Amino acid sequence: MIFQSFILDNLVSLCLKIINSVIVVGLYYGFMTTFSTGPSYLFLLRAHVMEEGTEKKISATTGFITGQLVMFISIYYAPLHIALDRPHTITVITLPYLLLYFLGNNQKNFLNYVYKNQNSIRHFSIQRIFFQNLFFQLLNPFFLPSSILMRLANIYIFQSNNKVLFLTSSFVGWLIGHVFFMKWIGLMLVWIQEKNNSIKSTVAIRSNKGVLAKFRKSMFQIFLIFFFITCLYYLGRIPPIYFFTPKMSEIKERGEIEKREGEIDIEINSQRAGSKQEQKITAEEKLSPYLFSKKNNNLDKIKEENDIFGFQKPLVTILFDYNRWNRPLRYIKNDRFENVVRNEISQFFFFTCQSDGKERISFTYPPNLSTFQKMMEMKISLFTRDIISYEELSNSWRSTNEEKKKKLTNEFLNRVEVLDKESLPVDIFENRIRLCNDEKKQKYLTKEYDPFLNGPCRGQIQKWFSPPIQKETYKKNSLFINKIHGILFSNTNNYPKFEQKKNIFDRKSLLTDINFFFNLITKFSRKSVSSLNFEGLYLFPKDNKGKMSSKKKKFLFDTIRPDLNDNKIVNLQKCIGINEIVKKLPRWSYNLIDELEQLEGKKKVEYHQIRSRKAKRVVLLTKNSQNDDNYDETTDTDNTEKKKELALIRYSQQPDFRRDIIKGSIRAQRRKTVTCKLFQRSVDSPLFLEKMEKTSFFCFDILDSSKIFFMFKNWIRKKKELKNSDYTDEKAKESQKKEEEKIKKNEKEEKRRIEIGEAWDSIIFAQVIRGCLLITQSILRKYILLPSLIITKNIVRILLFQFPEWSEDFRDWQREMYIKCTYNGVQLSETEFPKKWLTDGIQIKILFPFRLKPWHRSKLRFTEKKKDPLKNKKVKKKNFCFLTIFGMEVELPFSGYPRNRFSFFDPILKELKKKMKKLKNNFFLILKIVNERTKNFITTLKETSKRIIQSILKKVLFLNKKIKKLYNYLFLFRFKKIDELNQNKKNFPITKNNPIIYESTILIQAINKTNCSLTEKKIKAINAKTKKIIKKIERMTKENKGGFLISEINSNSKKTSSNTKGLELEKKILQILQRRNVQLTHKLYSFFKFLLNFMKKVYTDIFLCIVSVPRINVQFFLESTKKIINQSIYNKKTNEEIIDKTNQSIIHFISIINKSSNTKNTNSAANSYEVSALSQAYVFFKISQIQVLNVYKYKFKYVFDYDGRSFFIKDEIKDYFFGIQGIIHSKLRHKNSPVSLKNQWTNWLKVHYQYDLSQNRWSRLVQKNLKNRINKHRLDQNKDLTKCDSYKKTQLIVSKNKKQQVDFLVNLLIQKKIKKQSRYDLLLYKFINYAEKKELSIYGYRSPFQANKKRAISYDYNTQKKEFFDRMDDISIKNYIAEDAIRYIEQNRDRKYFDWVVMDVKIQNNSISNLQFSFFFKFLRFYDAYRNKPWIIPIKFLFLHFSVNQNFNKIKNIIEKKRRIDIFKPWKKKKILEVELETPNRAKKEYTSRVDLNKPSLSNQEKDIEEDYGESDSKKGGKDKNKKKYKNKIEAEVNLLLRKYLNFHLNWKGSLNKRVINNVKVYCLLIRLKNIKQIAISSIQRGELSLDIMMIQNEKDSTLTGFRKKKEFIEKGIFIIEPVRLSRKNNEQFFMYETARLLLIHKSKRQINQRNPEKSDLDKQIFYKNIPPKRDQRITQNKEKKHYALVVIENILSARRRRELRILICFNPRSINSMPRKTIFDNENKINNCCQVFAKNKDLDKEKKILMNLKLILWPNYRLEDLACINRYWFDTYNGSRFSIVRIHMYPRLKMR
């Protein structure tokens, strides 16, 4: 066993060491980089395949490996990396190599004429191959960007300690991978060659050697082309030549303007100097031999050098400018700065610094500070730092912190002690100090420049104090203000504009400073400054004071004004002096604008550089300031600047994938993006294509018998003409469907129109072509096509001998108007073209389009013929259209279907149809008459013919009778002869031997059918005939036997008589007829049988379908009801068993949960719930329903046996699991004895300091009236299904009287819900820190739940749980009882547990999105958790008080609540509803008062803020005497709005958008026309101009206040004023007030003084005067105004001192000696980078406990701004994004016993 463990341990440790070693990691990463191939591999493979000779192959591989080695070295060696990364390297390497490669391939003996040996190394081709592979390996990252495999080594090298070893191992790994790769390629080439040889051997093809030779030569040219293309791949991204770019032209223009301004300034200065030359001769003579006498010469030399460098600089950047303006992909813009910050450079800079008494690596150290420190150490020996030991640093840091902390804590504790004495001295609260100049006059600085309020301003300000009224003129003060200060306060108008003044200085005091300054210059400057005249330094005259000129002051100082827009700012490039070392942010050297700015006309620039959303500027109206009636563009050039344009910006609806990209910049290589449609909103990923909705083009539905039946049934129903009661409903539904289909069709048509318009807009030069085509079509139509049609029509009329209609036709032709419109359809005029119509597009609208008519009717005839308006219900067609490029007419632009034109032949055809109808009518009358006469004639003929035929038939019958008589006589005579012959035959033997056998006749039996049919009758008739014939034959035979004599006939004769033949024929015919009849009857029978069977089958199927449908439905209903009944019976049985074995309270819990979940499920069907939202009862009830195995029982037993969790599980649950499942241990079982219950909960509650009430206070709580009142309140609250009171608790505290005890504990248990969240948090902390089985006391502070053990355990059950922003514990800390609070407890239910059943409806109605997270289901879970848990919604206490929309949205929920109140107890909550309805009305009044523009007023809250922080902006605006005069009312009122609210939305109602836009289009046309009447009336008739929208009639009311006064605008929603709540102008006071409110805690939240809360009311006007009055002040309405029921200890100290004390408490000096944790950021010098502030120390003392308890009060949880406070305090940094400078464990983890 020992040997086995030894082996295993060694193997594991050895494997871990090998895997984690630098060599293995380097080999792995180097091998992985082999797979990052580039164009260099192509040249290497080309050399191995195409080149002949081993020397060339070796040179190619050596060049390739050398290039890769250089790339690996460049990762470690920074100068080499910078050199290879510079853009000039590409131009230096590629361009000369291209030349050499071209010459080497085209000239065979180029540089090789001396060396005849082709395989020599000195041969140029071998060198060329070597350098080719080397250069391409270096240029690989430029041409084809390196993959992630190549970047792995670059990433890991920053994490490895031994960087050189890692690089060498990675290079070796790459070399191994390269060898394997080349070997594999060699094997592939050999296999391909063998395959080709085998093919050549089998197929004998004579190869053409000349073709192969040409192909081999062409390969060189192909590779040359490929090489040139790869070079251009990167070089092609460079913009055009620098001099021809638009930015260069702008820079040149700016330079010329600056030069002109400089010349003008020099001329003005020279003129002023000449005028005052005589006065200043003595002063110049005195100052001439001194320091600045020869400065100008030196300045001229430096300027010349700068000019030379400025001339040479563009020559370098002609081919490549790495700072070019289109280099970045994105452009982060900031209007406050002149240029834009570059975003691709990292802001992190690593350097060592001292922090917390240790030397650490800081990655946010200012780089300029480190460079300055190095420069000082290199140049001057005085600035070298002494190396301080680790212990000295820690000791000094610890001592300073200890001293600071002791002072602050002592001061703080002294103030608290004074508060405990219940006295009210003035000095308890530390007030904020403000800087004053004079105490008597009370002149103090403004808030912007007060260092105690806003930090140091770093400037010199004199006599600028706010309380006294300032004069209009200010004195010229000296000002050297910081650049940052000037930038930040450039837009504010709360301080005066300072002017520069000549500074008066003391020359003698300046001498030493100047000497030291020039000594510094000699140290730092490369060139000597001996040319400066130092002789005059000591030759100052004896005058103590003098004046310095402004030019000489620029030599030393760099001045800047606060206002950046001032033209008098000193040009910093021309100033020479000390460069201030500040943190220089990398900025672009260009200031770019986007397309929108160019369209809006903010900056007058010819070209924009940033692409924005595709938009076009549509000019609606161009107004000239001199002449209002002249709107044409053909004006003089002098008047063009005076024009004012009314324009709109039209945005394209195409998907915008450009996203503010700079023109000409490198595009991001976007992969895995698919565009499935021609026009789609966004790019889709192929991963989600399956989840997208796809339209199916074909539908394959299998037709079942039931479907056929229903289709047949519907078809029958349609044929029926019965009118049911549902007929009208069906008609309404059909009409509604038709309307919906019509709307959908219009939407599709609109979408199609937009797509066509966008397509025209996206194609290059499409708008130019389309515009030209439209204009040509309009000209052709107006002047060629229509006149030619008029001429031809009238000529034809003349030829047809009709009068021509020239005047009528030309009148209609002149009426047709062609109005030029914008691309959107906004009408301009006939002559005015829209601006940039060739690029932006144009539409041509035809008003009163011409219709060629064959004839014109007279007006009298037209007016006489009037139709009934009721009958004429057809809608009139629009009398306008738009022209297309094909000359067609459409109703709307880009409509797909052309308009049906009025045909010239339509009226002719109508007339012809009318005439044809008349002819038809006449013809049919004639036909009718003819038909009647022919019918009469035919009837008479029939009658006569019948008579004739009857007479003939009678005669024929008479003849037939006579013939029959004759025949009978003859027949009898014949039979006599036959008898005689028969008797003679009897004598012959033949007759005896051969007797005649007569055929027996068989009667045809009829079919036994009950129904008599035609076939049966026929059969009967045939049978009767056959019977008659048989009887005749029998009778005749009898007569023959009677003795007729027949003559003898010879028996040998073969002839028979004619009589016998006739009989046989008749016999045969009868037999044939009988057979045919029988066959026919049989066939008819089978046919009828088949037909009957078929009909029977069809009808039975139909009948079965009819019967089966209700049978199936009934069966399904019965089965479902049976299941429901069985399930309900089973549930009832299980519930009865649970009721018998468990406590009744659990049923109450579950019923409430079921009700709440049911009400919630009605709103959202598929919501996922979090486990934390469920209660214990619900979870354990679900567990109990599962058949738990023994294994799981033991697991649950382990859960319940854990001593920490038993207090969090309810006793009912424990009893249930103990009694039924047998899981819980018996000692944890709930006992009914009060003593055991008290002992059980005292172990838990002894750490809760809230249960700290006195006995007197407790006795007040036990009163019966108070108890009953709370009980009623809680019962009502439970009926409302509120989440906060859905639990019942067990008993906790025992009093002396058992009756009072039971009643009291029942009421008290309700408050246990408030403690649920805190206990749950503690359970989580305990579970997380279970491994560290150490007590909480090691951290040195008391638990927030620790209480006084001497006092009785009690709790205030009237706690109002309000949710403020101190979540240190979720239990209320108020320990006093106020009857007022109980009285208004429902009104003040603004606590953590809201009525989430009501709020959930509101949240789900206002859902954020309808996305279905198919792949990322975790996001859906979090989203649903936020929807279903309204208690995590932020409380309105933080937000602005004028957000009225939120209050208006609450009215729905209040109305719903009112319904439920009416159901339960309306008389109880009537008052509550009134109070809740008051707040929206009050907010509405407040809102309207704020929107009032005539009387701008502020809310009470803002007035309170103004009293503390000074006058408001509106008051300051009133005092301003130099107020700007506005030209019109609208401009003045808009500025008034912007002054107060910064921005407003003035928008129309959505339902009126289309109508309003149509009105605007007509207005734009009517404004330009002179004769408006005709077109206005026609547009009103057509419905384009709606009169109900035209409310604005007078110019006097066309102002914002005029709109507000009219109720019609607001009621109809035409004019809406909505404030944008994003930001406010100069609102520092408001934000400071809101920040201060976070520190405040309301009086209903906590109460520190346990003994007497009324005595602890102190004067808190400093903090509470900003708080607006709330409903909670009803509690203290009978008390004094100056006293409040709260003391917040944190507010005793000022904000700055409080912050300092927090920081010092965090930096615990006692934890310095503990060893720090090792992190991955430790470097070779072992500089610690992280420390554990809160170390585990068991030696606890009293002082430390006090300090840590103070920390709990002074350091609230969830205060991220304190991180920034530490940052600014400790390192004096101003960048708020650096939260990770000091890495400390600020919030300790809670650990319970």
From Swiss-Prot:
Part of the Tic complex. InterPro entries: TIC214. The chain crosses the membrane at residues 11-31, 64-84, 90-112, 129-149, 172-192, 222-242. Residues 1504-1524 are annotated as: Disordered. GO terms for cellular component: chloroplast inner membrane. It comes from the Eukaryota. GO terms for biological process: protein transport. Its main location: plastid. It comes from Lotus japonicus. It is a multi-pass membrane protein. This is Protein TIC 214. Keywords: Chloroplast, Membrane, Plastid, Plastid inner membrane, Protein transport, Transmembrane, Transmembrane helix, Transport. It is found in: Plastid, Chloroplast inner membrane. Belongs to the TIC214 family. Involved in protein precursor import into chloroplasts. May be part of an intermediate translocation complex acting as a protein-conducting channel at the inner envelope. Pfam families: Ycf1.
